[in-house]
Amino acid sequence: MVVREYNEELKYIEKISPNSYLIKKGFQPNMNVEGIFYANSKLERLMFDELRNSCRPGMTGGFLPGVKQIANVAALPGIVGRSVGLPDIHSGYGFAIGNMAAFDMSNPVSIVSPGGVGFDINCGVRLLRTNLFEKDVKPVQEQLAQSLFDHIPVGVGSKGIIPMNAHDLEEALEMGMDWSLREGYVWAEDKEHCEEYGRMLNADPSKVSMRAKKRGLPQLGTLGAGNHYAEIQVVEEIYDKFAASKMGIEELGQICVMIHSGSRGFGHQVATDALVEMEKAMKRDKIETNDRQLACARINSVEGQNYLKAMAAAANFAWVNRSSMTFLTRQAFAKQFNTTPDDLDMHVIYDVSHNVAKMEEHMVDGRPKQLLVHRKGSTRALPPHHPLIPVDYQLTGQPVLIGGSMGTCSFVLTGTEKGMAATFGSTCHGAGRSLSRAKSRRNLDYKDVLRDLEAKGIAIRVASPKLVQEEAPDSYKDVRDVVQTCHDVGISAKAIKLRPIAVIKG
């Protein structure tokens, strides 16, 4: 690794617009392309402080600073365009969380890297709307929060209540939301409002280890812990009335439900298994990287293809997982209001993935190319008229769901043409951590965090209260800064702001 004084490091980073910073070749060894990151004045300070701290004598161990991780990704074989850091970027395993990179599938040296997807494969967000308003929910806010908490299994060791045997799991891994539809857990239209229509077709359950399947079998239909949550939210602001109306959001005060979860222990095991195989492939094919956490394999190698097929199965697991929780959420609301989910208009606005690698067609140097786009802590954001988004959103662009930290606002954005050119149709995914989990536990008291939420009028139900400080707003960047930066640089556009009134956490 290159070790330089902080002032020397800064020579490789150039501010090219009010919210954009170029990372020049040479910042890290063997960079094939430049890097770029997006940050406003507040977010920029965090990026540079992290870099400055890493330059101090004796500062070793842990993850590299985000800006170094962006540059190391820029050195991977077959990368095209730039290695992109979104405004919510923070250090992660291999790739930073909030790092997007695309690889030319026609180039035989191009790679796929599990570190570019993350351990929680297809961690993502689903947003449901209702025809209820805050005035309808406020009188029963606590009861509704409890009903949701009772219906959805949450917490570290939570087990699902959706009936599932080994054969069902195999089918769910291959079919994704088509399995949920067949079993009666979703409405037919839910699939239309889901990235990839809730099913990655290249999934192959035979490429998944028995250990992963054993971990995943009891966990379908569970929220898990960490930063995962189910929130009852209120529409607080509408920035784009036309886009909001296409999503079924007409007025302020309307009630929505956001479900944030992923592939649980199943996806984690798929990633762990793949990293072992990738290290062998790297030795055989003499692939060198700047960081051993960037373990990878040629896309068209056996290991590369096996990972992509197993990753797709994990993505399908996550869509079935969120679909099962959608079913349970609809039941909880119907029970509380003594009606049906249909009568409550509990439609899915959209479902997006934040951790995935996908084959997509993009323009590179004026020509269409098939790319493998790695999005880790990054959301696909397709523009109006794109063939991969449903008819309902052809005029608005794809809805992009951005969850805030616990107790803070969330946003719905829309994809833009500029984003297609600048970031291969990618934008931020959330607030992004500013404190590590360990520092959060040391610096914050969970009782204070719970009191603050109650003071804001938020009903809170938590399976593991002592883990709450890890997810406190003080542990994260301000999601408003993140979203505004994306809006200002034009890679996505603000449509709706949502405020939580009830939070269910593991």
Swiss-Prot record:
EC number: 6.5.1.8
Keywords: GTP-binding, Ligase, Manganese, Metal-binding, Nucleotide-binding, tRNA processing
Residues engaged in binding GMP: 227-231, 354-355, 403-406, 410, 429-432, 505
Binding annotation for Mn(2+) 1: 120, 123, 228
GO cellular component terms given for this protein: nucleus; tRNA-splicing ligase complex
Residues given in the record as Mn(2+) 2 binding sites: 123, 260, 354
Keyword GTP-binding assigned: yes
GO molecular function: GTP binding; metal ion binding; RNA ligase (ATP) activity; RNA ligase (GTP) activity
HAMAP family assigned to the protein according to its UniProt record, in alphabetical order: RtcB_euk (MF_03144)
Family indicated by similarity: Belongs to the RtcB family.
Protein name as it appears in the record: RNA-splicing ligase RtcB homolog
